[in-house]
From Swiss-Prot:
It comes from the Bacteria. Keywords: Cell membrane, Membrane, Transmembrane, Transmembrane helix. The lineage of its organism: Bacteria, Bacillati, Bacillota, Bacilli, Bacillales. The keyword Transmembrane applies. This is Uncharacterized membrane protein YvbJ. The chain crosses the membrane at residues 56-78. The keyword Cell wall biogenesis/degradation does not apply. It comes from Bacillus subtilis (strain 168). It is found in: Cell membrane. One of its GO terms (cellular component) is plasma membrane.
Amino acid sequence: MLFCKNCGSQNNEGAKFCKQCGTPIGGGSKQANQETASTAETRQAPRKPIPKKTIILWSSIAAACVILFAAYKTGAYFTSKDRLVDKFEQAVNDGDQDQIATLLTPVNDNLKLTKNNVKPFLTYLKDHPDKKDELFASLRDETAQKDIVYAEKDGKSLLVFDHYDLKVAPVYFEVSSNYKNTDLYVNKEEAGSVKKADQAQTLGPYIPGEYTVSAKLKNDVVDLVKKEDIQAIGDSSFRVDLSLEADDVTFSLANDIKSGKGDLLINGKSIHKDPFKSVTYGPLLTDGSMTASVEAEFPWGKTKTAGVPIDDKEMELTLIPDQDTQEQIMNTIVKTTKQYSKALSDGNTAQMTEASANWKAETKDTVDSMKSADSYLKDRYLETDFDLDTFALSQKNDGTWQVSVTGKELHQSSSYNDYTKSEMTDDSPSYEYLLSYDKKQKKWIFEDAESTFESAGTNIKKIKNDKPETYTSAWAGSKNKGSESSASGDVTDEQVTLFMGSYLQSQADAVNQNNFSLMEDSLEKGSSLYSDQQHLVSKLNKEGTTEDFNNYEVKSWSQNGSAITIKTYEEFYITKSGGSPKLRTYNWTYTGVVKNGRIYLTSIQ
């Protein structure tokens, strides 16, 4: 019997096609039977299976190979030069000083890198980005020359991988200075001191970078510092000369100081040396920025003289009175000048209370000479400008202390005779005044005033005559009646013009200095103008307004008995607080009274 392979129906022996589905079945039956038999034989003899242990063994070996290969690759990556350079670059870009100190290996074991001492290196790279780029390019280039940091192979890691270090060579500073025991600093950290003047001291090692090397020397009166910024790159040693710009200075007093005992002060501090003997002290600056003064017992008390700028290695000190003593001296000179002006008009030298007998005698001789020559003087003393830089103390052979100072006076004066008219003009003579200290009277006495050239100094103090008066020679002759005020108190064109000029200037000064007394002697007390101007001075000063008197003109004036009317044109530059000067012009009519030849204003409109 044959069975159809397609539908499984039974067919007769020898059939070629299935009677059920028509599938050919003829001769293939024998082949099929043979295949079936072969398959049966195969099933009867199966292949022997691989042992489980063998499978596990080979699987383990394969896995181990994979792991070892991966581990090798991982180890090679983590120990590679490129990764080390990448980490270093990242640390630099992040400013990670701890990481930089860890990654760098000093060539010299004496250089210990820390978070703090790698900062100069990092600063250099930040300040020079082009150099930073060059550095990392050289680290990655196998053929590049060594830069300040370079990669160097140093043995093996885990006996397999190449190990690299980032090497850095240290730098040193060869520092010298001109004074022994000068302290040396590198980036504000003390690094040593000078053992011998001008002999170099080696400071280091340091990591390459940007540094400030400084030398400091401090004594009782001076703190000297010299600094130099160093870019310590490209070499191993850097020479730095930090010579301090200072000198040992020898002090002595001027030859006209006979005796004394005191204390030499530098910048107001005692160095415990007697200046009345030659003294050498240092180091000190000689550029004029430091001063020397003397504290001593003078007849007028223990005082400290004014400071003299130290501008040389050999200083001959001029003793300069202290500020209070200067004020006393200048006030004495101004008072004597006022008394001298009056004495020249009447010959009365007894009222010269601050003058020496010799100066009184000279004044008397001047008056007698004018009388004998029929010469007259009309004078109004206004002020003196003192050159404070010309003050100097000295001693006479007998030990008497004297002082000299120069000043320029301002007068309105006229010298005339019986045949000329008196015309007052500004006169500005310059004098060198000499005063002596009187121990018995305990005050300064005016000795002399010698004509001199006008001082070119800029340290000037102006002292005004608080109550200027015009004095005329009492012996003036009758041939010049037109030049004098009449007995009735009539005033002249000249008087009116000079009066108004003085009044307007004093008005500006009063406003600027908030000092009404500077102008009140030109005003009638109790008048409306007196009260108004007193209020105005205070008001303008509080507002911060200032006045600069520029020009004026007396357009006309008239006098009727003691009453006077004056019409003026005036120019002032007015500056309000925070503003700029602006020119203001005014036309005023003043009224006033004349008393004993003097004008006193009472109102303005």
